[in-house]
Amino acid sequence: MLAMDFAPQNRLGAAVSVAKDFVSRRPNDRFALVAFSEYALTQIPLTFDHQAMINSLEKLQVNEQASGTAIGMGLAKAVARTFQKVRQKSRIIILITDGVNNTGEIDPLTAAQMAKELGIKVYPIGVGSQGMVPFPYSDPIFGNRFINTFIELDMPTLNKIAEITNTGKAAMATDAKLLGSIMSQIDRLEKTQWTAKFSYNFSEQFMPFLWLAFGLLLLEILLKSFVMPLLPDQL
């Protein structure tokens, strides 16, 4: 995600920017963030706290010591840890990657099947142009510079994930503008209508007055039946 083919940002910076914009456009949604390279880690669990989500996005960094990309593990963790107990009708995962699954115990297609069984849609997005791309390199003599590096992007697997989870076909973003357009399209597709249900609790207040009226009526009957006949006529 450090490749600079999304200049002036690298791929990670571009992905973070569009993700923050996506969050800001959906004020009623909950979000979670799972980051993966060699390992998959939950950065923030499912939350309505959008500022916390944005803060987590801004803190994302590339682990340059990682020796692989675990797409399957990242997707599986998003499914199992984030959505397993969530019952909303619309549950989606936006899977953004620029590499090939080459490590991890769970295959991406197995993770996609897990998502399908729970009714979760996965929108895979491959970022970056395939082939030789400018990549930052710290040279001990010449300092920081860029070298052209070959980075492979496994679009066939991403397409299969989309097919399994019924989202059609994976998208490929070769620049920041196209990535933003793809996210906007997902935003339009996944609009959820919310139905508000209200429960009203009416407390009946007339019963004390009813009992009071009944008591007064009973008292009147008793007076007429037992007390009034005993009184002298002249009173």
Regions found by a protein language model. Name each.
Residues 1, 22-30, 57-64, 78-86, ...:
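Sec/Tat-exported extracytoplasmic proteins
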Residues 1-89:
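Membrane-embedded segments
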Residues 2-4, 42-43, 102-106, 131-135, ...:
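Extracytoplasmic/secreted cell-surface and envelope-processing proteins
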Residues 15, 78, 122, 162, ...:
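Residue-level signature of catalytic and energy-coupling elements of molecular machines
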Residues 34-37, 96-99, 125-128, 173-174:
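Active-site-proximal beta-strand/loop segments in catalytic clefts of secreted hydrolases
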Residues 69, 92, 99-164:
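VWA/integrin I-like adhesion module and closely mimicked acidic/polar interface patches used
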Residues 172-206:
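Juxtamembrane amphipathic/hinge helix adjacent to a transmembrane helix
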Residues 192-235:
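C-terminal signal-anchor/stop-transfer transmembrane helix together with its immediate cytosolic
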